[in-house]
From Swiss-Prot:
All ranges on the Cytoplasmic side of the membrane: 1-30, 554-633
Region described as Disordered: 588-633
Gene: slc6a9
Membrane topology: Multi-pass membrane protein
Tissue and organ expression note: First expressed in early tailbud stage embryos in the midbrain and anterior spinal cord, and weakly in the hindbrain. By late tailbud stages, expression extends posteriorly in the spinal cord to appear in between somites. Expressed in the forebrain, retina, between the somites and in the blood islands by the swimming tadpole stages.
Composition bias type Polar residues, residue spans: 591-602, 617-633
Entry keywords, A to Z: Amino-acid transport, Cell membrane, Glycoprotein, Membrane, Neurotransmitter transport, Symport, Transmembrane, Transmembrane helix, Transport
Protein's name in the database: Sodium- and chloride-dependent glycine transporter 1
Organism superkingdom: Eukaryota
CDD domains named in the record: SLC6sbd_GlyT1
Transmembrane segments: 31-51, 58-78, 113-133, 209-229, 238-258, 283-303, 330-350, 373-393, 429-449, 453-473, 493-513, 533-553
Protein backbone atom coordinates (compact mmCIF):
# COMPACT_ATOMS: atom_id res chain seq x y z
CA UNK A 1 0.00 0.00 0.00
CA UNK A 2 1.40 3.42 -0.95
CA UNK A 3 2.26 6.08 1.57
CA UNK A 4 -0.17 8.87 2.31
CA UNK A 5 1.67 12.14 1.82
CA UNK A 6 0.54 15.08 3.97
CA UNK A 7 -2.90 13.57 4.29
CA UNK A 8 -3.38 13.31 0.54
CA UNK A 9 -3.99 10.13 -1.42
CA UNK A 10 -0.78 8.76 -2.95
CA UNK A 11 -1.80 9.36 -6.55
CA UNK A 12 -2.10 13.09 -5.89
CA UNK A 13 1.39 13.28 -4.45
CA UNK A 14 3.26 11.26 -7.04
CA UNK A 15 2.50 13.36 -10.10
CA UNK A 16 5.15 16.03 -9.58
CA UNK A 17 6.73 15.35 -6.20
CA UNK A 18 10.42 14.62 -6.08
CA UNK A 19 10.35 13.32 -2.51
CA UNK A 20 7.44 10.89 -2.44
CA UNK A 21 7.76 10.21 1.27
CA UNK A 22 7.47 13.79 2.52
CA UNK A 23 5.98 15.53 -0.49
CA UNK A 24 6.97 18.85 -2.07
CA UNK A 25 5.37 22.16 -2.83
CA UNK A 26 3.03 22.08 -5.81
CA UNK A 27 5.23 24.71 -7.45
CA UNK A 28 7.78 27.31 -6.47
CA UNK A 29 5.25 30.13 -6.25
CA UNK A 30 3.55 28.32 -3.37
CA UNK A 31 6.80 28.26 -1.41
CA UNK A 32 7.55 31.93 -2.06
CA UNK A 33 4.02 33.03 -1.13
CA UNK A 34 4.04 30.87 2.01
CA UNK A 35 7.39 32.30 3.08
CA UNK A 36 6.19 35.84 2.39
CA UNK A 37 3.08 35.14 4.47
CA UNK A 38 5.28 33.73 7.23
CA UNK A 39 7.70 36.66 7.30
CA UNK A 40 5.15 39.43 6.72
CA UNK A 41 3.11 39.42 9.90
CA UNK A 42 1.42 41.73 12.35
CA UNK A 43 4.73 43.32 13.35
CA UNK A 44 5.12 44.81 9.88
CA UNK A 45 1.93 46.79 10.44
CA UNK A 46 1.95 47.64 14.12
CA UNK A 47 5.64 47.76 15.06
CA UNK A 48 7.81 48.97 12.18
CA UNK A 49 5.99 52.29 11.50
CA UNK A 50 6.23 53.16 15.19
CA UNK A 51 9.95 52.31 15.33
CA UNK A 52 10.53 54.35 12.21
CA UNK A 53 9.00 57.59 13.50
CA UNK A 54 10.52 57.09 16.96
CA UNK A 55 14.03 56.59 15.59
CA UNK A 56 14.39 59.44 13.17
CA UNK A 57 11.78 58.89 10.47
CA UNK A 58 13.39 58.43 7.07
CA UNK A 59 16.83 58.35 8.67
CA UNK A 60 15.89 55.04 10.29
CA UNK A 61 15.67 53.48 6.83
CA UNK A 62 19.46 53.69 6.47
CA UNK A 63 20.42 51.44 9.41
CA UNK A 64 17.35 49.30 8.69
CA UNK A 65 18.46 48.40 5.17
CA UNK A 66 22.10 48.07 6.24
CA UNK A 67 21.01 45.42 8.74
CA UNK A 68 18.86 43.78 6.06
CA UNK A 69 21.85 43.41 3.73
CA UNK A 70 24.44 42.27 6.27
CA UNK A 71 22.28 40.21 8.62
CA UNK A 72 18.72 39.64 7.43
CA UNK A 73 19.24 38.23 3.94
CA UNK A 74 22.32 36.13 4.85
CA UNK A 75 20.57 34.47 7.80
CA UNK A 76 17.45 33.94 5.71
CA UNK A 77 19.51 32.26 2.97
CA UNK A 78 21.35 30.11 5.50
CA UNK A 79 18.15 28.72 7.02
CA UNK A 80 16.52 28.10 3.64
CA UNK A 81 19.58 26.30 2.27
CA UNK A 82 19.94 24.30 5.50
CA UNK A 83 16.39 22.92 5.36
CA UNK A 84 16.34 22.42 1.60
CA UNK A 85 19.64 20.50 1.51
CA UNK A 86 18.59 17.97 4.14
CA UNK A 87 14.85 17.93 3.31
CA UNK A 88 14.23 17.84 7.05
CA UNK A 89 12.52 20.04 9.61
CA UNK A 90 14.16 21.88 12.49
CA UNK A 91 15.07 18.61 14.28
CA UNK A 92 16.18 16.43 11.39
CA UNK A 93 18.65 18.98 10.00
CA UNK A 94 20.84 18.51 13.07
CA UNK A 95 22.16 15.28 11.71
CA UNK A 96 24.80 17.73 10.56
CA UNK A 97 26.09 17.75 14.15
CA UNK A 98 23.85 15.75 16.50
CA UNK A 99 25.16 17.40 19.65
CA UNK A 100 23.35 20.59 18.57
CA UNK A 101 19.95 18.97 18.12
CA UNK A 102 18.88 20.91 21.20
CA UNK A 103 18.86 23.97 18.94
CA UNK A 104 16.01 22.32 17.02
CA UNK A 105 14.12 21.58 20.23
CA UNK A 106 14.66 25.19 21.27
CA UNK A 107 13.12 26.32 17.98
CA UNK A 108 10.13 24.08 18.65
CA UNK A 109 9.65 25.58 22.11
CA UNK A 110 9.81 29.11 20.69
CA UNK A 111 7.34 28.24 17.91
CA UNK A 112 5.01 26.74 20.52
CA UNK A 113 5.00 29.90 22.63
CA UNK A 114 4.53 32.17 19.64
CA UNK A 115 1.83 29.95 18.16
CA UNK A 116 -0.16 30.06 21.41
CA UNK A 117 -0.33 33.83 21.84
CA UNK A 118 -0.22 34.72 18.14
CA UNK A 119 -3.49 32.91 17.55
CA UNK A 120 -5.05 34.81 20.45
CA UNK A 121 -4.18 38.06 18.65
CA UNK A 122 -5.80 36.62 15.53
CA UNK A 123 -8.89 35.68 17.54
CA UNK A 124 -9.19 39.28 18.81
CA UNK A 125 -8.95 40.46 15.20
CA UNK A 126 -11.76 38.02 14.39
CA UNK A 127 -13.81 39.54 17.23
CA UNK A 128 -13.34 43.07 15.86
CA UNK A 129 -14.03 41.81 12.35
CA UNK A 130 -17.41 40.43 13.41
CA UNK A 131 -18.14 43.51 15.57
CA UNK A 132 -17.55 45.74 12.53
CA UNK A 133 -20.56 44.22 10.78
CA UNK A 134 -22.89 46.90 12.13
CA UNK A 135 -24.24 50.13 10.72
CA UNK A 136 -22.30 51.99 13.42
CA UNK A 137 -19.03 50.76 14.87
CA UNK A 138 -19.60 49.93 18.56
CA UNK A 139 -16.57 51.99 19.63
CA UNK A 140 -17.78 55.19 17.97
CA UNK A 141 -19.79 56.76 20.81
CA UNK A 142 -19.78 56.91 24.60
CA UNK A 143 -23.40 55.87 25.15
CA UNK A 144 -22.76 52.18 25.77
CA UNK A 145 -23.08 50.19 29.00
CA UNK A 146 -19.31 49.73 29.26
CA UNK A 147 -18.44 53.44 28.99
CA UNK A 148 -17.35 55.57 31.96
CA UNK A 149 -17.81 59.23 32.78
CA UNK A 150 -14.30 59.93 31.45
CA UNK A 151 -15.23 58.78 27.96
CA UNK A 152 -15.13 61.54 25.34
CA UNK A 153 -15.67 60.48 21.77
CA UNK A 154 -14.61 62.75 18.94
CA UNK A 155 -18.00 62.17 17.29
CA UNK A 156 -20.17 62.04 20.42
CA UNK A 157 -22.75 64.84 20.52
CA UNK A 158 -24.09 63.46 23.79
CA UNK A 159 -20.98 62.01 25.36
CA UNK A 160 -20.70 61.29 29.05
CA UNK A 161 -18.79 64.50 29.49
CA UNK A 162 -21.83 66.44 28.17
CA UNK A 163 -19.91 68.70 25.84
CA UNK A 164 -21.39 70.19 22.70
CA UNK A 165 -18.76 70.59 19.99
CA UNK A 166 -19.42 73.27 17.43
CA UNK A 167 -16.01 73.74 15.86
CA UNK A 168 -12.54 72.33 15.65
CA UNK A 169 -11.41 74.86 18.28
CA UNK A 170 -14.04 73.59 20.69
CA UNK A 171 -12.79 70.09 20.01
CA UNK A 172 -9.26 71.19 20.81
CA UNK A 173 -10.44 72.88 24.01
CA UNK A 174 -12.34 69.74 24.94
CA UNK A 175 -9.26 67.60 24.39
CA UNK A 176 -7.00 69.89 26.40
CA UNK A 177 -9.59 70.28 29.16
CA UNK A 178 -10.10 66.58 29.50
CA UNK A 179 -6.37 65.96 29.62
CA UNK A 180 -6.09 68.43 32.47
CA UNK A 181 -9.10 67.29 34.50
CA UNK A 182 -10.62 63.98 33.61
CA UNK A 183 -7.84 62.31 31.60
CA UNK A 184 -9.96 61.64 28.53
CA UNK A 185 -10.39 58.06 27.43
CA UNK A 186 -11.60 57.36 23.93
CA UNK A 187 -14.57 55.11 23.13
CA UNK A 188 -12.21 52.74 21.32
CA UNK A 189 -9.97 52.42 24.38
CA UNK A 190 -12.91 51.73 26.69
CA UNK A 191 -14.34 49.26 24.19
CA UNK A 192 -10.97 47.48 24.15
CA UNK A 193 -10.37 47.44 27.90
CA UNK A 194 -13.87 47.29 29.37
CA UNK A 195 -15.84 45.32 26.78
CA UNK A 196 -13.51 43.10 24.75
CA UNK A 197 -10.95 42.25 27.42
CA UNK A 198 -12.86 43.21 30.58
CA UNK A 199 -9.36 43.54 31.90
CA UNK A 200 -8.67 42.75 35.55
CA UNK A 201 -6.53 44.81 37.89
CA UNK A 202 -3.69 42.30 38.21
CA UNK A 203 -2.02 39.56 36.19
CA UNK A 204 -2.85 37.07 38.93
CA UNK A 205 -6.57 37.89 38.83
CA UNK A 206 -7.75 35.69 35.96
CA UNK A 207 -11.44 36.37 36.50
CA UNK A 208 -13.68 34.72 33.93
CA UNK A 209 -13.05 33.34 30.48
CA UNK A 210 -14.46 35.75 27.89
CA UNK A 211 -16.76 33.44 25.95
CA UNK A 212 -16.84 35.58 22.77
CA UNK A 213 -13.04 35.53 22.65
CA UNK A 214 -13.01 31.81 23.38
CA UNK A 215 -15.36 31.24 20.47
CA UNK A 216 -13.19 33.35 18.17
CA UNK A 217 -10.12 31.42 19.36
CA UNK A 218 -11.85 28.20 18.37
CA UNK A 219 -12.68 29.67 14.96
CA UNK A 220 -9.07 30.76 14.50
CA UNK A 221 -7.62 27.33 15.32
CA UNK A 222 -10.25 25.63 13.15
CA UNK A 223 -9.29 27.79 10.17
CA UNK A 224 -5.59 27.05 10.71
CA UNK A 225 -6.24 23.31 10.95
CA UNK A 226 -8.44 23.18 7.85
CA UNK A 227 -5.84 25.07 5.84
CA UNK A 228 -3.16 22.59 6.96
CA UNK A 229 -5.30 19.46 6.78
CA UNK A 230 -3.13 18.15 3.93
CA UNK A 231 0.06 19.87 4.98
CA UNK A 232 1.81 21.97 2.37
CA UNK A 233 -0.47 20.54 -0.30
CA UNK A 234 -3.45 22.45 1.11
CA UNK A 235 -1.70 25.45 2.68
CA UNK A 236 0.16 25.99 -0.59
CA UNK A 237 -3.17 26.65 -2.28
CA UNK A 238 -4.58 28.83 0.49
CA UNK A 239 -1.61 31.23 0.41
CA UNK A 240 -2.54 32.37 -3.08
CA UNK A 241 -5.22 34.37 -1.27
CA UNK A 242 -3.89 34.87 2.27
CA UNK A 243 -0.49 36.15 1.12
CA UNK A 244 -1.72 38.45 -1.64
CA UNK A 245 -5.03 39.93 -0.50
CA UNK A 246 -3.43 41.91 2.39
CA UNK A 247 -1.61 43.94 -0.27
CA UNK A 248 -4.93 44.68 -1.95
CA UNK A 249 -6.33 45.91 1.38
CA UNK A 250 -3.19 47.93 2.13
CA UNK A 251 -3.48 49.61 -1.26
CA UNK A 252 -7.19 50.38 -0.78
CA UNK A 253 -6.53 51.86 2.67
CA UNK A 254 -3.54 53.81 1.32
CA UNK A 255 -5.55 55.35 -1.53
CA UNK A 256 -8.32 56.25 0.90
CA UNK A 257 -5.86 57.57 3.45
CA UNK A 258 -3.92 59.96 1.23
CA UNK A 259 -7.15 61.63 0.12
CA UNK A 260 -7.92 62.72 3.69
CA UNK A 261 -7.14 66.10 5.20
CA UNK A 262 -3.94 65.95 7.23
CA UNK A 263 -2.71 62.72 5.67
CA UNK A 264 0.38 64.44 4.30
CA UNK A 265 1.26 65.66 7.79
CA UNK A 266 1.17 62.10 9.06
CA UNK A 267 3.31 60.80 6.19
CA UNK A 268 5.83 63.61 6.66
CA UNK A 269 5.97 62.80 10.36
CA UNK A 270 6.69 59.22 9.38
CA UNK A 271 9.36 59.96 6.76
CA UNK A 272 11.06 63.25 7.67
CA UNK A 273 14.66 62.25 8.45
CA UNK A 274 16.36 63.27 11.66
CA UNK A 275 19.91 62.42 10.68
CA UNK A 276 21.39 63.13 14.10
CA UNK A 277 19.60 60.07 15.47
CA UNK A 278 21.57 57.58 13.37
CA UNK A 279 24.50 58.31 15.67
CA UNK A 280 22.55 56.77 18.57
CA UNK A 281 23.23 53.12 19.34
CA UNK A 282 19.56 52.53 20.15
CA UNK A 283 18.55 53.30 16.56
CA UNK A 284 20.93 50.68 15.18
CA UNK A 285 19.84 48.22 17.84
CA UNK A 286 16.17 48.71 16.97
CA UNK A 287 16.96 48.32 13.26
CA UNK A 288 18.88 45.09 13.80
CA UNK A 289 16.26 43.67 16.15
CA UNK A 290 13.37 44.51 13.83
CA UNK A 291 15.10 42.87 10.85
CA UNK A 292 15.95 39.79 12.89
CA UNK A 293 12.51 39.27 14.40
CA UNK A 294 10.39 40.28 11.41
CA UNK A 295 12.05 37.75 9.09
CA UNK A 296 11.27 34.89 11.47
CA UNK A 297 14.88 33.79 11.90
CA UNK A 298 15.53 31.00 14.45
CA UNK A 299 11.84 30.10 14.77
CA UNK A 300 12.33 26.92 12.76
CA UNK A 301 9.71 27.91 10.19
CA UNK A 302 12.16 28.85 7.44
CA UNK A 303 13.97 25.53 7.73
CA UNK A 304 10.65 23.69 7.70
CA UNK A 305 9.19 25.46 4.68
CA UNK A 306 12.42 25.03 2.69
CA UNK A 307 12.51 21.31 3.51
CA UNK A 308 9.55 20.82 1.15
CA UNK A 309 11.42 22.38 -1.78
CA UNK A 310 12.86 20.27 -4.53
CA UNK A 311 16.55 19.67 -3.98
CA UNK A 312 17.85 21.90 -6.78
CA UNK A 313 15.49 24.82 -6.16
CA UNK A 314 17.25 28.19 -6.26
CA UNK A 315 16.73 29.17 -2.62
CA UNK A 316 19.39 31.89 -3.02
CA UNK A 317 17.07 33.78 -5.34
CA UNK A 318 14.08 33.09 -3.10
CA UNK A 319 15.81 34.41 0.03
CA UNK A 320 16.52 37.75 -1.63
CA UNK A 321 12.99 38.09 -3.04
CA UNK A 322 11.26 37.19 0.23
CA UNK A 323 13.50 39.33 2.46
CA UNK A 324 13.14 42.43 0.30
CA UNK A 325 9.38 41.89 0.00
CA UNK A 326 9.11 41.70 3.78
CA UNK A 327 10.98 44.96 4.33
CA UNK A 328 9.20 46.77 1.50
CA UNK A 329 5.88 45.74 3.04
CA UNK A 330 6.91 47.26 6.37
CA UNK A 331 7.73 50.58 4.70
CA UNK A 332 4.51 50.51 2.67
CA UNK A 333 2.42 49.76 5.76
CA UNK A 334 3.89 52.85 7.39
CA UNK A 335 2.30 55.03 4.70
CA UNK A 336 -1.06 53.37 5.31
CA UNK A 337 -0.91 53.77 9.08
CA UNK A 338 0.41 57.33 9.26
CA UNK A 339 -1.85 58.73 6.55
CA UNK A 340 -4.85 57.78 8.70
CA UNK A 341 -3.18 58.88 11.95
CA UNK A 342 -2.29 62.22 10.33
CA UNK A 343 -5.95 62.70 9.44
CA UNK A 344 -6.98 61.83 12.99
CA UNK A 345 -4.43 64.22 14.50
CA UNK A 346 -5.65 67.04 12.25
CA UNK A 347 -9.25 66.30 13.21
CA UNK A 348 -8.36 66.44 16.91
CA UNK A 349 -6.07 69.43 16.53
CA UNK A 350 -3.13 67.66 18.16
CA UNK A 351 0.33 66.55 17.09
CA UNK A 352 0.70 63.19 15.34
CA UNK A 353 2.82 61.95 18.22
CA UNK A 354 -0.24 62.23 20.48
CA UNK A 355 -2.13 59.59 18.51
CA UNK A 356 0.74 57.36 17.35
CA UNK A 357 1.05 54.01 19.09
CA UNK A 358 2.33 50.50 18.45
CA UNK A 359 1.38 46.91 19.14
CA UNK A 360 -2.17 46.13 20.27
CA UNK A 361 -2.64 49.80 21.14
CA UNK A 362 -2.32 50.71 17.46
CA UNK A 363 -4.30 47.80 16.02
CA UNK A 364 -7.19 47.76 18.48
CA UNK A 365 -7.38 51.32 19.85
CA UNK A 366 -5.75 54.11 17.83
CA UNK A 367 -6.45 52.92 14.28
CA UNK A 368 -10.04 51.77 14.98
CA UNK A 369 -10.76 55.16 16.53
CA UNK A 370 -9.40 56.88 13.43
CA UNK A 371 -11.62 54.71 11.24
CA UNK A 372 -14.73 56.01 13.02
CA UNK A 373 -14.04 59.42 11.49
CA UNK A 374 -14.39 58.07 7.94
CA UNK A 375 -17.63 57.80 5.97
CA UNK A 376 -18.82 54.19 5.73
CA UNK A 377 -16.52 53.41 8.66
CA UNK A 378 -17.73 49.78 9.06
CA UNK A 379 -16.46 48.97 5.57
CA UNK A 380 -12.96 50.28 6.30
CA UNK A 381 -12.96 48.53 9.65
CA UNK A 382 -13.95 45.20 8.08
CA UNK A 383 -11.16 45.54 5.52
CA UNK A 384 -8.56 46.49 8.14
CA UNK A 385 -9.29 43.63 10.52
CA UNK A 386 -9.65 41.14 7.68
CA UNK A 387 -6.16 42.18 6.62
CA UNK A 388 -4.86 41.61 10.17
CA UNK A 389 -6.48 38.17 10.21
CA UNK A 390 -4.81 37.17 6.95
CA UNK A 391 -1.42 38.52 8.05
CA UNK A 392 -1.68 36.56 11.27
CA UNK A 393 -2.84 33.36 9.60
CA UNK A 394 0.07 33.42 7.16
CA UNK A 395 2.49 33.28 10.09
CA UNK A 396 0.38 30.82 12.08
CA UNK A 397 0.30 28.30 9.22
CA UNK A 398 4.07 27.99 9.32
CA UNK A 399 4.28 27.91 13.12
CA UNK A 400 1.92 24.93 13.27
CA UNK A 401 3.55 23.18 10.31
CA UNK A 402 6.95 23.61 11.99
CA UNK A 403 5.79 21.63 15.01
CA UNK A 404 3.95 18.98 13.00
CA UNK A 405 6.84 18.45 10.58
CA UNK A 406 9.34 18.14 13.43
CA UNK A 407 7.24 15.46 15.12
CA UNK A 408 6.57 13.51 11.91
CA UNK A 409 10.21 13.67 10.75
CA UNK A 410 11.49 12.62 14.16
CA UNK A 411 9.26 9.54 14.41
CA UNK A 412 9.54 8.92 10.69
CA UNK A 413 7.64 5.63 10.38
CA UNK A 414 4.98 4.88 7.79
CA UNK A 415 2.14 5.14 10.30
CA UNK A 416 2.94 8.67 11.45
CA UNK A 417 3.35 9.82 7.85
CA UNK A 418 0.06 8.22 6.85
CA UNK A 419 -1.79 9.88 9.74
CA UNK A 420 -0.06 13.24 9.65
CA UNK A 421 -3.47 14.91 9.59
CA UNK A 422 -4.20 13.52 13.06
CA UNK A 423 -0.90 14.94 14.31
CA UNK A 424 -1.92 18.32 12.92
CA UNK A 425 -5.31 18.05 14.64
CA UNK A 426 -3.68 17.05 17.93
CA UNK A 427 -1.25 19.97 17.88
CA UNK A 428 -4.10 22.37 17.02
CA UNK A 429 -6.24 21.09 19.92
CA UNK A 430 -3.34 21.41 22.36
CA UNK A 431 -2.66 24.94 21.08
CA UNK A 432 -6.31 25.86 21.58
CA UNK A 433 -6.35 24.52 25.15
CA UNK A 434 -3.12 26.32 26.05
CA UNK A 435 -4.55 29.55 24.65
CA UNK A 436 -7.65 29.51 26.87
CA UNK A 437 -5.94 31.30 29.82
CA UNK A 438 -5.18 34.16 27.43
CA UNK A 439 -8.92 34.69 26.89
CA UNK A 440 -9.51 35.41 30.58
CA UNK A 441 -9.68 38.88 32.09
CA UNK A 442 -5.93 38.73 32.79
CA UNK A 443 -5.19 37.33 29.35
CA UNK A 444 -3.70 40.49 27.87
CA UNK A 445 -1.10 40.61 30.65
CA UNK A 446 0.02 37.06 29.88
CA UNK A 447 -0.05 37.65 26.14
CA UNK A 448 2.31 40.61 26.44
CA UNK A 449 4.49 38.70 28.91
CA UNK A 450 4.92 35.87 26.39
CA UNK A 451 5.53 38.32 23.56
CA UNK A 452 8.26 40.14 25.48
CA UNK A 453 10.09 37.17 26.99
CA UNK A 454 9.27 33.88 25.24
CA UNK A 455 10.65 35.02 21.88
CA UNK A 456 13.19 37.72 22.65
CA UNK A 457 16.83 37.15 23.56
CA UNK A 458 16.36 33.38 23.36
CA UNK A 459 15.96 33.67 19.57
CA UNK A 460 19.21 35.60 19.36
CA UNK A 461 21.08 32.92 21.30
CA UNK A 462 19.59 30.13 19.19
CA UNK A 463 20.52 31.88 15.95
CA UNK A 464 24.06 32.60 17.14
CA UNK A 465 24.65 28.96 18.12
CA UNK A 466 23.24 27.81 14.78
CA UNK A 467 25.76 29.98 12.90
CA UNK A 468 28.63 28.68 15.03
CA UNK A 469 27.54 25.05 14.65
CA UNK A 470 27.23 25.19 10.86
CA UNK A 471 30.17 27.46 10.05
CA UNK A 472 32.74 26.38 12.62
CA UNK A 473 31.77 22.94 13.96
CA UNK A 474 30.52 21.33 10.77
CA UNK A 475 32.84 23.55 8.74
CA UNK A 476 32.25 26.38 6.33
CA UNK A 477 34.12 24.70 3.47
CA UNK A 478 31.95 21.60 3.65
CA UNK A 479 28.78 23.67 3.87
CA UNK A 480 29.77 25.81 0.89
CA UNK A 481 30.40 22.62 -1.12
CA UNK A 482 27.00 21.30 -0.05
CA UNK A 483 25.34 24.43 -1.39
CA UNK A 484 27.32 24.21 -4.62
CA UNK A 485 26.19 20.60 -5.05
CA UNK A 486 22.58 21.67 -4.44
CA UNK A 487 22.41 24.92 -6.44
CA UNK A 488 25.16 24.42 -9.00
CA UNK A 489 27.14 27.38 -7.71
CA UNK A 490 28.77 28.18 -4.37
CA UNK A 491 27.33 30.92 -2.17
CA UNK A 492 28.63 34.33 -3.26
CA UNK A 493 31.73 35.58 -1.44
CA UNK A 494 29.66 38.26 0.29
CA UNK A 495 27.46 35.63 1.93
CA UNK A 496 30.45 33.53 2.88
CA UNK A 497 31.95 36.49 4.73
CA UNK A 498 28.62 37.39 6.35
CA UNK A 499 27.98 33.85 7.57
CA UNK A 500 31.43 33.47 9.08
CA UNK A 501 32.01 36.91 10.55
CA UNK A 502 29.54 39.76 10.00
CA UNK A 503 26.16 38.14 10.75
CA UNK A 504 27.34 36.41 13.97
CA UNK A 505 28.84 39.74 15.02
CA UNK A 506 25.54 41.55 14.42
CA UNK A 507 23.66 38.81 16.28
CA UNK A 508 26.01 39.26 19.22
CA UNK A 509 25.43 43.02 19.03
CA UNK A 510 21.66 42.45 19.15
CA UNK A 511 22.09 40.27 22.23
CA UNK A 512 24.21 42.89 24.02
CA UNK A 513 21.79 45.63 22.97
CA UNK A 514 18.83 43.61 24.27
CA UNK A 515 20.51 43.16 27.64
CA UNK A 516 21.55 46.82 27.95
CA UNK A 517 18.15 48.17 26.89
CA UNK A 518 16.19 45.75 29.07
CA UNK A 519 13.46 47.31 31.17
CA UNK A 520 10.90 45.38 33.24
CA UNK A 521 7.70 44.96 31.27
CA UNK A 522 4.67 47.12 31.95
CA UNK A 523 1.28 47.52 30.30
CA UNK A 524 0.22 51.16 30.22
CA UNK A 525 0.55 52.16 33.89
CA UNK A 526 0.52 48.61 35.24
CA UNK A 527 3.87 47.33 36.50
CA UNK A 528 4.30 43.57 36.40
CA UNK A 529 5.11 41.96 39.76
CA UNK A 530 8.46 40.26 40.27
CA UNK A 531 6.97 36.76 40.21
CA UNK A 532 5.45 37.40 36.78
CA UNK A 533 8.77 38.68 35.42
CA UNK A 534 10.44 35.57 36.84
CA UNK A 535 7.97 33.43 34.89
CA UNK A 536 8.85 35.45 31.80
CA UNK A 537 12.55 34.71 32.20
CA UNK A 538 11.78 31.04 32.79
CA UNK A 539 9.86 30.95 29.50
CA UNK A 540 12.84 32.51 27.75
CA UNK A 541 15.27 30.07 29.34
CA UNK A 542 13.06 27.05 28.61
CA UNK A 543 14.02 27.20 24.93
CA UNK A 544 17.70 27.98 25.48
CA UNK A 545 18.17 25.29 28.14
CA UNK A 546 17.28 22.64 25.54
CA UNK A 547 20.67 23.20 23.91
CA UNK A 548 23.01 22.25 26.81
CA UNK A 549 20.64 19.58 28.15
CA UNK A 550 20.50 17.73 24.85
CA UNK A 551 24.26 18.16 24.36
CA UNK A 552 24.89 16.46 27.72
CA UNK A 553 22.43 13.71 26.83
CA UNK A 554 24.04 13.14 23.42
CA UNK A 555 27.56 12.97 24.85
CA UNK A 556 26.38 10.49 27.47
CA UNK A 557 24.78 8.25 24.83
CA UNK A 558 27.64 8.44 22.33
CA UNK A 559 30.19 5.70 21.87
CA UNK A 560 33.67 6.08 23.32
CA UNK A 561 35.78 5.19 26.33
CA UNK A 562 36.73 8.74 27.24
CA UNK A 563 34.88 12.04 27.37
CA UNK A 564 36.81 13.39 24.38
CA UNK A 565 35.92 10.35 22.27
CA UNK A 566 32.26 10.70 23.17
CA UNK A 567 32.37 14.42 22.43
CA UNK A 568 34.00 13.82 19.05
CA UNK A 569 31.39 11.23 18.09
CA UNK A 570 28.57 13.53 19.22
CA UNK A 571 29.88 16.44 17.16
CA UNK A 572 30.61 14.74 13.84
CA UNK A 573 27.80 14.39 11.27
CA UNK A 574 25.67 11.28 11.51
CA UNK A 575 25.87 8.67 8.76
CA UNK A 576 22.53 9.69 7.29
CA UNK A 577 23.39 13.40 7.06
CA UNK A 578 23.07 14.80 3.56
CA UNK A 579 20.47 14.89 0.80
CA UNK A 580 17.39 12.84 1.64
CA UNK A 581 17.19 11.10 -1.74
CA UNK A 582 19.98 8.83 -2.89
CA UNK A 583 19.77 10.24 -6.41
CA UNK A 584 21.10 13.52 -4.99
CA UNK A 585 23.86 11.98 -2.89
CA UNK A 586 26.73 12.75 -5.25
CA UNK A 587 30.34 13.67 -4.57
CA UNK A 588 31.50 12.80 -1.08
CA UNK A 589 28.00 11.63 -0.15
CA UNK A 590 28.13 8.93 -2.84
CA UNK A 591 30.77 7.11 -0.78
CA UNK A 592 28.28 6.72 2.06
CA UNK A 593 25.36 5.70 -0.15
CA UNK A 594 26.00 1.96 -0.24
CA UNK A 595 26.48 1.73 3.52
CA UNK A 596 23.49 3.95 4.15
CA UNK A 597 21.28 1.96 1.79
CA UNK A 598 22.14 -1.36 3.41
CA UNK A 599 21.48 -0.08 6.92
CA UNK A 600 18.40 1.97 6.03
CA UNK A 601 16.16 0.58 3.25
CA UNK A 602 14.06 3.78 3.32
CA UNK A 603 17.05 5.67 1.98
CA UNK A 604 16.71 3.89 -1.38
CA UNK A 605 15.50 6.07 -4.25
CA UNK A 606 11.77 6.48 -3.99
CA UNK A 607 11.37 6.96 -7.72
CA UNK A 608 13.86 4.71 -9.53
CA UNK A 609 12.11 5.13 -12.88
CA UNK A 610 12.72 8.86 -12.75
CA UNK A 611 16.37 8.26 -11.95
CA UNK A 612 16.82 6.00 -14.96
CA UNK A 613 15.43 8.72 -17.17
CA UNK A 614 17.45 11.52 -15.62
CA UNK A 615 21.03 10.34 -16.07
CA UNK A 616 22.25 13.87 -15.56
CA UNK A 617 20.98 16.82 -13.61
CA UNK A 618 21.15 20.25 -15.17
CA UNK A 619 21.06 23.15 -12.79
CA UNK A 620 20.73 26.76 -13.76
CA UNK A 621 23.33 28.87 -12.03
CA UNK A 622 23.05 32.47 -10.95
CA UNK A 623 25.21 33.55 -13.88
CA UNK A 624 22.77 32.03 -16.36
CA UNK A 625 25.08 29.16 -17.31
CA UNK A 626 24.12 25.51 -17.04
CA UNK A 627 25.99 23.26 -14.64
CA UNK A 628 25.73 19.55 -15.32
CA UNK A 629 26.21 16.87 -12.70
CA UNK A 630 26.50 13.23 -13.78
CA UNK A 631 24.24 10.92 -11.87
CA UNK A 632 26.12 8.46 -9.67
CA UNK A 633 23.38 5.85 -10.00
Amino acid sequence: MGLCVNGAVPSEATKKDENLKRGNWGNQIEFVLTSVGYAVGLGNVWRFPYLCYRNGGGAFMFPYFIMLIFCGIPLFFMELSFGQFASQGCLGVWRVSPIFKGVGYGMMVVSTYIGIYYNVVICIAFYYFFASMNRVLPWTYCNNLWNTNNCAGVLSPNSSASFNLSSQQNLLNLTLGLNQTLKRTSPSEEYWRRHVLKISEDIGDFGEVQLPLLGCLGVSWLVVFLCLIRGVKSSGKVVYFTATFPYVVLTILFIRGITLEGAINGILYYLTPQWDKILHAMVWGDAASQIFYSLGCAWGGLITMASYNKFHNNCYRDSIIISITNCATSVYAGFVIFSILGFMATHLGVDVSEVADHGPGLAFVAYPEALTLLPISPLWSILFFFMLILLGLGTQFCLLETLVTAVVDEIGNDWIIRWKTLVTLGVAIIGFLLGIPLTTQAGIYWLLLMDNYAASFSLVIISCIMCIAVMYIYGHRKYFKDIEMMLGFPPPLFFQICWRFISPGIIFFILIFTVIQYRPIQYNDYLYPDWAITIGFLMALSSVICIPLYAIFKIWCSEGDTFLQRLKNAVKPSKDWGPALQEHRTGRYAQMSSTRSESNPEAQPLNPEKMKEDLSLTIQGSNGQAHTQDSKV
